[in-house]
């Protein structure tokens, strides 16, 4: 029972924070440190790692569900021109994930091993929080030149993808890095968020299957309870992420990202204090 409660709580946190620019990793670390829920033999180190990636995949399914029509090049509802535009969008997404493939996958394990500590996570939470506030203040006098995702060029997609690589540093936030990058490069908030969602699809599928493959190659297997726990976390993350995406896209129609910047600074400060007190490692 406690295992399912933990899966539900972490699934909720993942769903809420994966696409908001606030760092899902930082929030999950905090939650796991504070919950102290008895977890029996289910939450082994290997299973916990795979679980974290499986719930990220659940959040990705929310993107696919919400944007299925827009991302489906085979839709009978689309004209030939619209299908062509959809294929072009997918090519730009692929171009955008190339930096993550080249740098991210190569450095991800190194970063987790050497930078996954409260000093780094709290610092990146605070630094990017300040960055959001500074950049949004600058944007007040700048009119975005890219107001539709189809206006993103291949070159621009690659540059945004380079910003995504920054998220391999724990606490950065993948969506936060790509949204900031896209805004700096001239995209509107709406386009920046939308393209960030699309970039997450191949990245998270790739990372999840790599982690799963590594788990099984090392002789790992799931017990019946672990399978149930993973499925529950996956579904909860999917459902909550659906609402989180809807909320954010409605919110940024009339608001900027500064509130997320202030929030990151507060959470970063809390994370730092908890780290100094030994509550998180």
From Swiss-Prot:
For whether the record's keyword set contains Hydrolase, the answer is yes
Give the family per the record: Belongs to the UppP family.
Name it.
Answer: Undecaprenyl-diphosphatase
Alphabetical GO CC annotations of the entry are: plasma membrane
Q: What class of enzyme is it?
A: hydrolase
The keyword Nucleus appears for this protein: no
UniProt keywords (A-Z) are: Antibiotic resistance, Cell membrane, Cell shape, Cell wall biogenesis/degradation, Hydrolase, Membrane, Peptidoglycan synthesis, Transmembrane, Transmembrane helix
Q: Which domain of life is it from?
A: Bacteria
Name the Gene Ontology molecular function terms of this record: undecaprenyl-diphosphatase activity
Other remarks in the entry: Bacitracin is thought to be involved in the inhibition of peptidoglycan synthesis by sequestering undecaprenyl diphosphate, thereby reducing the pool of lipid carrier available.
Q: What is its EC number?
A: 3.6.1.27
- Regions that span the bilayer: 2-22, 46-66, 93-113, 115-135, 152-172, 190-210, 228-248, 259-279
Localization per Swiss-Prot or TrEMBL: Cell membrane
* Function of the protein: Catalyzes the dephosphorylation of undecaprenyl diphosphate (UPP). Confers resistance to bacitracin.
Example GO BP: cell wall organization
Membrane topology reported for the UniProt record: Multi-pass membrane protein
HAMAP family in UniProt: Undec_diphosphatase
- What reaction(s) does this enzyme catalyze? di-trans,octa-cis-undecaprenyl diphosphate + H2O = di-trans,octa-cis-undecaprenyl phosphate + phosphate + H(+)
InterPro entries, per the entry: UppP
């Amino acid at each position: 029972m406690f295992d399912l409660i933990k899966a539900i709580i972490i699934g909720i946190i993942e769903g809420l924070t994966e696409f908001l620019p606030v760092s899902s990793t930082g929030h999950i670390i905090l939650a796991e440190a504070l919950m102290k829920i008895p977890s029996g033999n289910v939450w082994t180190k290997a299973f916990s790692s795979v679980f974290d990636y499986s719930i990220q995949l659940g959040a990705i399914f929310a993107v696919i569900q919400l944007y299925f029509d827009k991302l489906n090049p085979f839709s009978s509802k689309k004209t030939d021109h619209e299908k062509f535009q959809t294929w072009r969008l997918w090519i730009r997404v692929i171009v955008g994930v190339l930096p993550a493939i080249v740098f991210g996958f190569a450095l991800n394990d190194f970063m987790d091993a050497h930078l996954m500590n409260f000093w780094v996570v709290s610092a990146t939470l605070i630094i990017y929080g300040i960055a959001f506030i500074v950049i949004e203040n600058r944007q007040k006098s700048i009119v975005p030149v890219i107001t539709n995702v189809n206006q993103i060029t291949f070159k621009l997609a690659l540059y945004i993808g380079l910003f995504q690589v920054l998220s391999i540093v724990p606490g950065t936030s993948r969506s936060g890095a790509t949204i900031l990058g896209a805004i700096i490069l001239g995209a509107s908030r709406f386009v920046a968020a939308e393209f960030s969602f699309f970039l997450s699809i191949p990245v998270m599928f790739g990372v999840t299957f790599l982690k799963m493959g590594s788990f099984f190659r090392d002789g790992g297997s799931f017990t019946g309870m672990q399978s149930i726990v993973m499925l529950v976390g996956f579904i909860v993350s999917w459902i909550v992420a659906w609402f989180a995406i809807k909320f954010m896209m409605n919110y940024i129609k009339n608001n900027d990202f500064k509130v997320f910047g202030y929030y990151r600074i507060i959470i970063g400060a809390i994370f730092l204090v908890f780290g100094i007190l030994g509550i998180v490692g």
